[in-house]
Amino acid sequence: MHHPRVRTAVAGLVAVLSLVPLAACGQSDSTAPPSSAKPATSASASLPRPKPYTGDFKKLEREFDARLGVYAIDTGTGREVTHNDRARFAYHSTFKALQAAVVLSTYSLDGLDKRVTYTREDLVAHSPVTEKHVDTGMTLKELCDASVRYSDNTAANLLFDPRAAGPKGLDASLEKLGDDITRMDREEPELSRWVPGEKRDTSTPRALAEDLRAFVLGKALRAPERAQLTTWLRTNTTGDAVIRAGVPENWVVGDKTGTGSYYGARNDIAVVWPPDSAPIVIAILSHRGTKDAEPDDELIAEAASVVVDSLSS
């Protein structure tokens, strides 16, 4: 694994160059028209040059036979790293962080003691926490904890408010936040059965990062609810091998992972706190080339390392 602390100074220089605005004028060569000629008007003349880190992401895509989407922003400087950041990907279980935020907004911390009962018939695959509490039920706070920190699928389904049309209600809440990109259509585990070309249960790296930033760093939640969401994300148990593995060890990471049933899909969205520096918001989404491909955490970790190199130089 190539961690940021062992990358070469050349990589850092390339990252710096990627953040310098392009000059307005073009370069000339021996075949260029004389100065009296009209400026070029072809489409190619107006195309932006590839960012230096784009080559790193494309190399990862080739190495892992994967499609990769990345959006990251240093909230202190506004500097961004982008790669397919406006393209659609299945979000998989990353939505659980946003869902918990909406629950916090709806009920506040004081309302999370409400107990939800359910039966064994309500259990779905990968429910390591809820399967132990069928007899007693769980509070909204316990369900959010199970959903965000353990990616418990039944907990997420129980948090979909039936009075607000389930997933569509969450979709509407995100639209009120300003996100008209993310589509919430199905519950677990069906939402993880995405196939290429499908728009259901998809978003973009940019949209997910902007949502996460609004909830964790912005004013979408009151301070007590924002602190609780941050605690859940920072104590997530499923993210050690993804974004956390691609940033320096002394950086604090709060994240929510996602894994698809098909095409080796693996995602992670995170807020990262470098020491003595403003937070960085990162969303990395991916899927691989064949339906039976396995997810590979290394792809996400390596992509996170590219992000850190590009923003830290």
Curated annotation (Swiss-Prot):
Pfam families named in the record: Beta-lactamase2 (PF13354)
Biological process annotations from GO: beta-lactam antibiotic catabolic process; response to antibiotic
Biased composition (Low complexity): 28-46
Residues the UniProt record annotates as site (Increases nucleophilicity of active site Ser): 96
UniProt keyword Signal, yes or no: yes
Active site per the UniProt annotation: 93, 188
Residues that, per the record, bind substrate: 151, 256-258
UniProt keyword terms in alphabetical order: Antibiotic resistance, Hydrolase, Signal
Substrates-to-products reaction catalysed: a beta-lactam + H2O = a substituted beta-amino acid
Disordered as annotated region, ranges: 28-52
GO molecular function, one term: beta-lactamase activity
EC number: 3.5.2.6
InterPro entries named among the record's database cross-references: Beta-lactam/transpept-like, Beta-lactam_cat, Beta-lactam_class-A, Beta-lactam_class-A_AS
Top-level lineage group: Bacteria
PANTHER family tied to this protein: BETA-LACTAMASE, BETA-LACTAMASE-TYPE TRANSPEPTIDASE FOLD CONTAINING PROTEIN
NCBIfam families associated with the record: bla_class_A
Note: The class A beta-lactamase family has a specific amino-acid numbering system, sometimes called Ambler or ABL numbering and often misspelt as Amber. A multiple sequence alignment was used to derive a consensus sequence and then the consensus was numbered taking into account insertions and deletions. This allows use of identical numbers, e.g. for active site residues, despite differences in protein length. UniProt always uses natural numbering of residues, hence there appear to be differences in numbering between this entry and some papers.
Family: Belongs to the class-A beta-lactamase family.
This protein's name: Beta-lactamase
